[in-house]
Amino acid sequence: VFCDVDLETYSFDMDTLPEEDIRIVFITHLLGLNSPIEQLKKKYPNAIFLEDICESHGVKAPNGMKRGSTGLGATFSFYYGHHMTTIEGGMICTDNEDLYELMKIKRSHGMARLLSPHLYKEAIENNPDIDPAFLFLTDGYNFRNTELNAVIGLEQLKRLDENIKLRRDNFDYFVNNVDPNLFYIPYNDPGNSSFAFPFVCKNPEDREKLKSIFDELGIEHRPIVSGNLLLHPFLKKWKDSVSVPNANKLNYGGVYIGNSQFITKDMMVKVFDAIKTKW
């Protein structure tokens, strides 16, 4: 099921969502912005909700609960460029016992010996002709992380809340200084956990000018994640299945630069001064 995106949250455009019953909703809190799960749950009360928090560690719902705790499960990425890192890898959170047990064996080739003891015993009893040390209950992957990666992550976890506050302060400055005549402004939700500064040009032809300014400043820039996914080869056959004008605005007019606890106000002033001077 395809729909358009909202230009303030980069999440679902509620007006383009289908009316039929949906079984599963995988919702992404993109670039640290807050996606409207509460609205979606009202629209699809029987759906299972899975959350993607890969770029949004610590983003909060209006009631103060952290995102990633309101659905069946949530994915977090600890890739090098995210809020905290274990160099590579990530984690899955869930309060569902069945999903928890499944994910444990999925990350380790599907082997039964990773189950909790009582379930492992049951699997052995149900499969007496198979060596219990190499009993595969499902297809799986080799996604086990290492102790070294865990040490790095645990140390960064101690500073995560402080770093998120610095990111929020930076994002607040960004939203209050970006020119609304030139750019679409993302929603400055107080619960955000900003990952980046997204510049979405109202005139798509201005994007190359903006990129050249960043290049002159030596600032790495990227598209707004994937832009319009329906233009990518693996989904292109469905590109005409739905009208997505907002996704196209992100695709053709959008670019982002990174936000982090290491970004200072002086750095941001330099960026905005360059845009004003060279536009």
Q: Could you describe each region identified by the protein language model?
A:
Residues 1-7:
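Short beta->alpha connector loops at strand-helix junctions that form conserved
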Residues 4, 24-28, 33-38, 46, ...:
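PLP-dependent aminotransferase class I/II
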Residues 8-86, 91-101:
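Active-site phosphate-binding strand-loop segment of PLP-dependent enzymes
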